[in-house]
């Protein structure tokens, strides 16, 4: 693995460490998501022998820990980091994403950050979202990451409505959150620690 990634663990960088000069100006989870590509500015692709998987690092490096399992017929597009003991299931498409150790993912994932021990083990689109540790997303859970009027996404945060400054933003999913099968999450949805989401329509943002 590249020396940059050996000496500065990505899993540490994305814990919102305010003392890190790298994230000195970042205040919110969406700032981290917008900065994913910056984490790889000094990295190079690193992965072992993976069969029947398409890896495209033309837009950024792909770094996969040797203990992870990438099942066949998966598409991986850089910049991308897949940590230790993580499983990426067959027919998945993952791009511009950081997946920490001991996760299980499937489906279409773009511009997301997964903290350790989280599962998205079934189909469904997850875009421009932050997923806390020990979250479990039920089959078919899908995020909207773009409004139909293409306006900037706003998020309710600490009792205030804050503009993310981007037309692309999905959801913030807290630690130990569980979503039922077929859950649809609107743009800018925030799910706090330990919530269980069961809904036949969009839950409140």
Q: Where in the sequence are the language-model features?
A:
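Conserved active-site and cofactor/substrate-binding residues in soluble primary-metabolism enzymes
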Residues: 27, 31, 59, 77, ...
């Amino acid at each position: 693995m590249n020396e940059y990634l050996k000496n500065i663990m990505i899993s540490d960088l994305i814990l919102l460490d305010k003392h890190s000069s790298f994230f000195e100006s970042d205040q919110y989870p969406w700032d981290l998501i917008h900065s994913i590509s910056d984490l790889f500015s000094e990295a190079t692709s690193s992965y072992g022998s993976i069969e029947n998987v398409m890896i495209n690092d033309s837009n950024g490096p792909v770094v996969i820990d040797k203990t992870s399992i990438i099942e066949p017929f998966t598409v991986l597009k850089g910049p991308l980091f897949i940590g230790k003991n993580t499983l990426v299931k067959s027919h998945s498409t993952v791009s511009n994403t950081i997946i920490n150790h001991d996760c299980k993912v499937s489906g279409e994932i773009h511009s997301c950050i997964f903290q350790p021990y989280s599962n998205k083990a079934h189909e469904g689109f997850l875009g421009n979202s932050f997923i806390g540790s020990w979250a479990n997303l039920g089959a078919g859970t899908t995020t909207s990451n773009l409004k139909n009027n293409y306006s900037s996404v706003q998020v309710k945060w600490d009792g205030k409505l804050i503009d993310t400054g981007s037309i692309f933003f999905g959801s913030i999913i807290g630690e130990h959150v569980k979503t039922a099968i077929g859950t649809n999450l609107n743009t800018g949805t925030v799910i706090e620690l330990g919530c269980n989401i069961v809904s036949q329509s969009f839950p409140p943002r």
